[in-house]
Amino acid sequence: MKGLRKYLSPFAPDQSGAAAVLCEFHGLIIILDAGGCAGNICGFDEPRWFESRSAIFSAGLRDMDAILGRDDRLVEKIGKACEKLSADFIAVIGTPVPAVIGTDYRALSRMIEKKTGIPALTIDTDGTKLYDDGEKKTWKELFKKFAVEKDVEPGRIGIIGATPLEFGGIYEEDFLKKYFAEKSFSKVVCYGMGDGLDAVREAAAAEKNIVVSPAGIAAAKYLQQKFGTPYELFCPPEIIPEWKEKKEQVAGLLNVEELSEKKILIVHQQVLANTLREEFISANINVASWFMMNKEQKKEQDILFKEEDDWITYIKENEYDIIIADPLLKKAVPFYKGEWYDLLHFAISGKKRQSV
């Protein structure tokens, strides 16, 4: 049955992805809902909510506000909030409610800017898609709104696509900046995870952009078209703290001749999964994901899952010797008898790596 889940919990939706991108940019983030969606974002999908301050609020829509489309009341609420809070911009994130009533996001953005004098952007998420779709829209809108012409700084790179939903279960926040700084880049900017809105404004100064998740590709393409900034899809395998040990464990099970005969499945977001595949060049490895997959990076045998039943059937019909995936997915395939190596994906399980 389509949409039926007996083993897997619901994955993070698009509005959570939008909020994850904007969380560290010192903006006033309004979830356009009655309260439930904002509660899910802060309570389940945004781990930084418990560790740092971020102005994420519910619009608190009432029945008649939604039915009559009282955008003026929302704008009035936002204006009052801005009198008490300092924000560099205002973001309104959509949910199923505005999708159903047909909210005019462009008009809403203009009304907010006129009322407050603060830059506003709106993200037309609708709660029916997954987190990566919301991230994709938000990254692109953010750079379209704020990035301006700048002279290129040699040795400066920008990292696009990092959020806790992509990596929150497996790495420390400053890992990517440290990793690329050690690769002789003079300045490393990680948008949304360590670097704020000023970095977005200066995005054109980057000599190159590194895209670490599929959700960042649309923004990287925009920056390439607008400012000529080249980009590369890459996510270092060392982002997984135990990767060296896990790689040695897998290699220890198999010698070089056996490796080419064994089937391995890696399940995560596509950029990271592809990077891990390259670590075992001689092996028969397929990449799978529940989230967007870039056609240019997708190999013939790679697979995109949509339903829980798709996952169960696929594992039954394909005898993999090793699976590298979030442990939550293992619950749906108790019959699997091969080797399983945990690779956390926060958007799937909501689980973070336990500090040792």
Show which residues each predicted segment covers.
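An N-terminal assembly and electron-transfer interface module characteristic of large anaerobic redox
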Residues: 1-356
